[in-house]
């Protein structure tokens, strides 16, 4: 592991000339996609592509679309020419992919089978896999969290290739900078391992989630109305199960600890909202795992986790999804200016590529890792929230310690309150375009490059600047009796916090608290993990997670995004 004293020297930011050279080949778009007012380009494109099903000839009822259903070819008759109207209807989403593929097979007089298969590569977990076999040729495998979704994805993959709808990727010049920034908003491809098909009504369902978050937070602060001032930065994790949504973790905050290093693990280093919410989510996971390991059938049934036949690790039960709501865009690359364009003769090309690089948070302010103040090497710094989101979309949100017990847990949907942004372009690029799907094949078993659905929703709370509460952070997880308030400057609980852990004033989200829960869970699970002498050792013993983390860091550096900062190892050399 690299020393913390050298991280700022190892980052490489491409020169302005390289940035301009890299973006010269970018060609103007040949088509313009017009979206309705109030919808992001992706939301509109996906809903049009996958949600509308009209009554057209050859549209098969869903119960008949089993894995054994096939279109019978007629070798005597010549194939029909594919009408342009058919292609346009499919591209507009007026025919769903499965129906469209069957119609294509009928017109071309070819045999079609939609067969259930196994997941490709090293992708394991609660995913169904289908592939289309057209005239004896097998096309790419489509995955989904249910059979309907995986069939649709498989049909779309086959049709896009048969109709030659896939446009070639623009050639990337080999420079040290990140990939070119798209000149105009585009409908991003969702042909990834875990693609999310946007069905009719999904946008309305997402809009309701922000209201659910608001109602839950209002309940938590019903007796302390002054806490409403924390709401501007609020982030929350929501469990979706059988169409029902439940808020399970909440965090607020816009600051991070940047003082001297404390080796006891009892200081909370990053109190930005989404980071605080994610650490609260970990506490929720620990409680759910204790339910499972209780061996009480009734309690095990309540747990969101279950056994995985192909592994000794637990996994989320089927039809359980995790959604993230953020009242505002996370700091870092997600806040890239929507108006930036790639005109190589303007400064915006440099700005766009620079903003896509990795960022570090120092006392709530954001810097490129290479430009971070030099005195930061003697203090604790954290990667930006945008960069941490990018990391979670590859490694999962569960972290190293919980990876001893469960498979990676990925976010299904990310919802952004529309109070301070009109589109999700920056977040789409930061999460979906900085890391290529090809990285999945290089990752350990169960890890993949996740592609969450991203959408704008009505803000749960208005954005407001309140200097009095600038440094304070609030956290809560399902099962907590009360809220906890942490001072981001000191990384400790405030005197006025409804919840206090004891004389040390350590937060229930700190590293020491997580290690304590880890030891308890290891005992309940009867796993020989207690031999780890320190927090750092327990993390390092999670071999697959550490391998995936190293591959992600190498990928980001090799593609010109900069180096992931490495904190001093002494902050993790503690035990209980």
Swiss-Prot record:
Annotated GO CC locations: cytoplasm; male germ cell nucleus; nucleolus
SMART domains attached to this UniProt entry: ADEAMc, DSRM
Pfam families (alphabetical): A_deamin (PF02137), dsrm (PF00035)
Nucleus is among the record's keywords: yes
InterPro entries attached to this UniProt entry: A_deamin (IPR002466), ADAD1_DSRM (IPR044455), dsRBD_dom (IPR014720)
Keywords, alphabetical: Developmental protein, Differentiation, Nucleus, RNA-binding, Spermatogenesis
Residue stretches making up the DRBM domain: 96-164
Domain A to I editase per the UniProt entry, residue ranges: 249-574
Localization: Nucleus
GO BP field: adenosine to inosine editing; RNA processing; spermatid development
Any one GO MF annotation of this record: double-stranded RNA adenosine deaminase activity
Family to which this protein belongs: Belongs to the ADAD family.
Free-text function comment from the UniProt entry: Required for male fertility and normal male germ cell differentiation. Plays a role in spermatogenesis. Binds to RNA but not to DNA.
Name listed for the protein in its UniProt record: Adenosine deaminase domain-containing protein 1
């Amino acid at each position: 592991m690299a020393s913390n004293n050298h991280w700022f020297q190892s980052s490489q930011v491409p020169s302005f000339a390289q940035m301009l050279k890299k973006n010269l080949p970018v060609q103007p778009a040949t088509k313009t996609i017009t979206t309705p007012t109030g919808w992001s380009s992706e939301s509109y494109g996906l809903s049009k592509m996958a949600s509308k099903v009209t009554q057209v000839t050859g549209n098969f009822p869903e119960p008949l679309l089993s894995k054994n259903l096939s279109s019978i070819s007629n070798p005597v008759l010549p194939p029909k020419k594919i009408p342009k109207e058919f292609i346009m209807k499919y591209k507009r989403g007026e025919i769903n992919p499965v129906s469209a593929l069957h119609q294509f097979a009928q017109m071309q007089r070819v045999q079609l089978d939609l067969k259930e298969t196994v997941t490709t590569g090293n992708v394991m977990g609660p995913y169904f896999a289908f592939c289309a076999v057209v005239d004896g040729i097998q096309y790419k495998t489509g995955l989904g969290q249910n059979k309907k979704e995986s069939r649709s994805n498989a049909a779309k993959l086959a049709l896009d290739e048969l109709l030659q709808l896939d446009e070639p990727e623009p050639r990337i010049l080999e420079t040290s900078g990140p990939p070119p920034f798209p000149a105009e908003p585009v409908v991003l491809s969702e042909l990834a391992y875990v693609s999310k098909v946007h069905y009719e009504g999904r946008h309305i369902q997402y809009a309701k989630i922000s209201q659910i978050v608001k109602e839950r937070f209002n309940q938590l602060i019903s007796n302390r109305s002054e806490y409403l001032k924390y709401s501007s930065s609020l982030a929350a994790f929501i469990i979706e199960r059988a169409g029902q949504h439940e808020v399970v973790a909440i965090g607020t905050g816009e600051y991070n600890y940047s003082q001297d290093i404390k080796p006891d693990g009892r200081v909370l280093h990053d109190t930005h909202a989404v980071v605080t919410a994610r650490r609260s989510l970990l506490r929720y996971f620990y409680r759910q795992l204790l339910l499972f390991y209780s061996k009480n059938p009734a309690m095990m049934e309540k747990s969101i986790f279950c056994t995985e036949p192909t592994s000794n690790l637990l996994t989320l039960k089927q039809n359980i999804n995790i959604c993230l709501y953020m009242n505002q865009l996370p700091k870092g690359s997600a806040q890239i200016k929507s108006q930036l364009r790639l005109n190589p003769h303007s400064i915006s090309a440099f700005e766009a590529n620079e903003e896509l690089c990795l960022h570090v948070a120092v006392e709530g302010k954001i810097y490129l890792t290479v430009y971070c103040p030099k005195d930061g090497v003697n203090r604790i710094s954290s990667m930006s929230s945008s960069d941490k989101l990018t990391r979670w979309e590859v490694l999962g949100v569960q972290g190293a310690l919980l990876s001893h017990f469960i498979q990676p847990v990925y976010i299904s949907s990310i919802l952004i309150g529309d109070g301070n942004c009109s589109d999700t372009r920056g977040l789409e690029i930061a999460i979906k375009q900085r890391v290529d799907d090809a990285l999945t094949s290089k990752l350990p078993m169960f890890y993949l490059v996740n592609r969450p659905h991203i959408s704008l929703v009505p803000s749960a709370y208005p954005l407001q600047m309140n200097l009095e509460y600038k440094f304070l952070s609030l956290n809560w997880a399902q099962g907590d009796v009360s809220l906890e308030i942490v001072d981001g400057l000191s990384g400790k609980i405030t005197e006025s916090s409804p919840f206090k852990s004891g004389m040390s004033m350590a937060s229930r989200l700190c590293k020491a608290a997580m290690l304590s829960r880890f030891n308890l869970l290891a005992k309940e699970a009867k796993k020989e993990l207690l031999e780890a002498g320190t927090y750092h050792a327990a993390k390092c013993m999670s071999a697959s997670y550490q391998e995936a983390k190293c591959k992600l860091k190498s990928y980001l550096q090799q593609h010109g995004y900069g180096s992931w900062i490495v904190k001093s190892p002494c902050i993790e050399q503690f035990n209980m």
